[in-house]
Amino acid sequence: IDPVNVKKLQCDGDTYKCTADLDFGDGR
């Protein structure tokens, strides 16, 4: 199950946190 309009998956190597870059553009 993938979120809608996932452009890319941003992974932070420091926190190992992956956030999907959605259309929302939260910038989180």
UniProtKB/Swiss-Prot annotation:
GO terms for molecular function: carbohydrate binding. It is found in: Secreted. GO terms for cellular component: extracellular region. The keyword Zinc does not apply. Keywords: Lectin, Secreted. Expressed by mycelium-forming spores. Its main location: secreted. Thermostable. Still fully active after heating to 70 degrees Celsius for 10 minutes. Alpha-(1-6)-linked L-fucose specific lectin. Homohexamer. Metal ions are not required for the saccharide-binding activity. This is Alpha-(1-6)-linked fucose-specific lectin.
